[in-house]
């Protein structure tokens, strides 16, 4: 399998720590390495990974090349501009196709936490086998442990199991549900979280793209020669319409299987998620860096550059950086995106 790591996102929900020039995937969110380096290391240890590619933007590429070990400079694929996930994955598929047309490629986010390396490797092996056996598009589904309204869901057919591979035919993809519907999904037993991880043969991907995303497929065909010749293709790229791989392809194809994950997973999509996975004091506070909580519980302090104190407050997130401070209730952290939008509209570029 050729591994493709998607590393072009901005991580706006992690403001003020995450910025355009140093986004979430390049931060030490958990552990001693950046999220991207942890992801690269995970795949380097897998025997069936032939090579690793990173897809990112032109602003982050030089930094990634310097910071990340284990990925060749020529394997850093640069998008001229952000076009959402479908074009980015298509660009990576062109690169891999030029190496081996019958290759299997796996697409994975750069910034998710995976616990259980052997179980993860087993799940990916099953996905590879299904993609080869059925010429199918395969996604990896996460077994839900609560009724989340923050993830999309995948419904599978329980009767369509593939021998010992824990793979099932996908019935539907569902967008992020409201709480009542999320509870119904989880209680039904035939829904999984959509973790944004995909495995397929390059040839199968382009066959499905030709059917369901005809315009994108045509544009990628025009770009292919320039990509293979290492020529500039930015003018052709600008004509591509942004679209997600879920909406553009996965929700439309009828040849999709899902493999149930056997590993522990967290997309670390917010500061609250960081709180949940981090070691805590006896009062259930998380203190990362220099900080103190008195008469308060369930707080998160992220403050590397100076001392931060919280007194008499519960369920608060405090993030300090050299030029900005965020104070927000833990149950409101999803609203950070609105704050970032405000900064953009008011041209506060120095804070972005």
Language-model features: locations:
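Conserved core of the sugar-phosphate nucleotidyltransferase
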Residues: 117-236, 257, 330
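Short histidine/acidic/glycine/proline-rich micro-motifs that form metal-
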Residues: 112-114, 144, 265
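Left-handed beta-helix
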Residues: 202-352
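A residue-level structural signature of the nucleotidyltransferase/glycosyltransferase Rossmann-like core
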Residues: 53, 105, 171, 190, ...
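Conserved N-terminal catalytic core of the sugar/cofactor nucleotidyltransferase
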Residues: 2-5, 13-16, 20, 31-109, ...
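Short beta-strand segments
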Residues: 6-7, 55, 106-109, 139-143, ...
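Residue-level signal for inorganic ion chemistry
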Residues: 36, 92, 111, 154, ...
């Amino acid at each position: 399998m050729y591994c493709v790591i998607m590393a072009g996102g901005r991580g706006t929900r992690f403001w003020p720590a995450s910025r355009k020039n140093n986004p979430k995937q390049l931060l030490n969110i958990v552990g001693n390495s950046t999220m991207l380096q942890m992801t690269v290391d995970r795949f380097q240890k897998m025997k069936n990974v032939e090579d690793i590619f990173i897809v990112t933007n032109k602003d982050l590429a030089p930094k990634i090349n310097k910071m990340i070990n284990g990925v060749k400079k020529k394997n850093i694929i640069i998008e001229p501009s952000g076009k959402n996930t479908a074009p980015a994955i298509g660009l990576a598929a062109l690169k891999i196709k030029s190496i081996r047309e019958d290759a299997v490629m796996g697409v994975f986010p750069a910034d998710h936490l995976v616990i259980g390396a052997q179980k993860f490797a087993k799940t990916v092996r099953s996905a590879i086998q299904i993609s080869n056996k059925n010429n199918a598009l395969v996604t990896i589904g996460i077994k839900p442990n609560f009724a989340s309204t923050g993830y999309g869901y995948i419904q599978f057919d329980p009767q369509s199991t593939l021998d010992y591979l824990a793979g099932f035919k996908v019935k539907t993809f569902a967008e992020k549900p409201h709480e009542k519907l999320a509870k119904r999904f989880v209680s039904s037993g035939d829904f999984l979280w959509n973790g944004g991880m995909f495995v397929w043969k390059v040839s199968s991907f382009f066959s499905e793209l030709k059917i369901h995303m005809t315009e994108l497929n045509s544009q990628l065909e025009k770009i292919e020669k320039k990509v293979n010749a290492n020529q500039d293709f930015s003018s052709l790229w600008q004509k591509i319409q942004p679209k997600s791989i879920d909406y553009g392809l996965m929700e439309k194809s009828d040849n999709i299987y899902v493999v149930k994950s056997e590993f522990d997973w967290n997309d670390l999509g917010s500061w609250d998620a960081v709180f949940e996975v981090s070691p805590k004091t006896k009062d259930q506070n998380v203190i990362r860096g220099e900080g103190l909580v008195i008469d308060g519980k369930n707080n998160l302090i992220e403050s590397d550059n100076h001392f931060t104190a919280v007194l008499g407050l519960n369920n608060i997130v405090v993030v300090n950086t050299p030029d900005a401070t965020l104070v927000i209730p833990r149950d409101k952290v999803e609203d950070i995106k609105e704050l970032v939008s405000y900064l953009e509209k008011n041209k506060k570029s120095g804070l972005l």
